[in-house]
């Protein structure tokens, strides 16, 4: 279970605690599935890609013809003419300098990936539930050591902010501005060719502000480093779990937080804003399997652990015809048989003449 607190406090824009409280929405008790979130994020992130391809003319913008056989050279097309290093050089092939690539990329590649609707909803519910676990937020790198509580809910007056300085003042009052400072300090030059493609800098992610109605809040928060803003009806896995990693620091407005039960419903009540959707339910109520196994009720009926048997990693195959120990293990009578043969062979043999006479007598 992700969160267990029954109520959540509401904080005013000056950082003081309001007398009002809200019940914790059912979505914060949804199962947290990192494997599902990672796979859905990988698929959904592919739908934002821009098609790319090399030019159809690349590598073929020259005149070249094969010289044929008889010159002890490869039959690859070669540039004609003379008076330059280019003449006589191979062209067109993917193994050639200035040639085309093998299998030139096309824009009609299959770029998009279809994801099941219920799977996407499950992943978003898991990401929302994970945003209510302080340990996951800290593990993701958010600086939330000084904030009053998680989930963090602020009054609806924040939705009417018009100026960025008002938004910055709010973040400082609720002790969330440390996360913004972390983002600003993390801004660095991107490694690779992205620097030349309008992606010159990279930086970490900061808080995600979720609102219900935009009466100026988007413009107030949009220019703060690392801060993203989204409507509660348009929650996105790419923002709730950037990189497929659970634990995004989310700041909710009061009305947006109260609308979560209508957006996601519960395990027994259908969601009002989704058709025939129920929240996923845990298969087991207590996820601490170790505690269950070690409980007195289960240990009282479980057999005691016997001596450990370690299977040999590699068993050498031995020839029983050459190895006496293996032969005696396979055929216990072999040892006695060899002993009898040895005893019989030790008996005094007949003289050569007697043996010859006995053979003649038989004939």
UniProtKB/Swiss-Prot annotation:
It is found in: Cytoplasm. Keywords: Cytoplasm, Ribonucleoprotein, Ribosomal protein. One of its GO terms (cellular component) is cytosol. The keyword Cytoplasm applies. Residues 280-363 are annotated as: C-terminal-extended nuclear localization signal. It holds the Pfam family Ribosomal_L4. Gene3D superfamilies: 3.40.1370.10. InterPro entries: Ribos_uL4_C_dom, Ribosomal_uL4, Ribosomal_uL4_dom_sf, Ribosomal_uL4_euk/arc_CS, Ribosomal_uL4_euk/arch. One of its GO terms (molecular function) is RNA binding. One of its GO terms (biological process) is cytoplasmic translation. Component of the large ribosomal subunit (LSU). Mature yeast ribosomes consist of a small (40S) and a large (60S) subunit. The 40S small subunit contains 1 molecule of ribosomal RNA (18S rRNA) and at least 33 different proteins. The large 60S subunit contains 3 rRNA molecules (25S, 5.8S and 5S rRNA) and at least 46 different proteins. uL4 is associated with the polypeptide exit tunnel. uL4 interacts with its chaperone ACL4 and the nuclear import receptor KAP104. Belongs to the universal ribosomal protein uL4 family. There are 2 genes for uL4 in S.pombe. Component of the ribosome, a large ribonucleoprotein complex responsible for the synthesis of proteins in the cell. The small ribosomal subunit (SSU) binds messenger RNAs (mRNAs) and translates the encoded message by selecting cognate aminoacyl-transfer RNA (tRNA) molecules. The large subunit (LSU) contains the ribosomal catalytic site termed the peptidyl transferase center (PTC), which catalyzes the formation of peptide bonds, thereby polymerizing the amino acids delivered by tRNAs into a polypeptide chain. The eukaryote-specific C-terminal extension harbors a nuclear import signal and delivers the ACL4-uL4/RPL4 complex to the pre-ribosome, triggering uL4 release from ACL4 and incorporation into the 60S ribosomal subunit. This is Large ribosomal subunit protein uL4B. The gene is rpl401.
